[in-house]
Amino acid sequence: VLEGMEGSYLEDVRVISADGKTITILEDGIKPTFYGDCDDETVAWIMERLTPQSTEIQKTPVSTSSERWGAIPRAYILCTEDRAIPIKNQEYFCKNHPCDPVVTKNTSHSPFMSEPQALANHLHALA
């Protein structure tokens, strides 16, 4: 899953469980990878609620078609300071799965935590 993700912090901070079923993030990697523009109090609140993530989402094949998924209007919010999915990868997604509009935010991976009102305003405008 991380192939072609040069610049992503994920490779250095993720821990796959012994049974291969879940991924956790090393505690010292959580803020720089996902919440770099959040204050420490917000990150502490988030960390109290994080749980291991299933690896199934990364292993399960997905089948799409241009007639079905390709016909759904899409928008994308580029997060320029994202350390989980580097900007070049986000731009690749937009190029290969056209989105209109593409909104660029100078935020980390998680604008829903660092700039929730601004993000909500963008989403409301899209609706």
Show where each model-derived region lies:
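Helix-loop "lid/cap" segments that line or gate small-molecule binding pockets
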Residues: 28-37
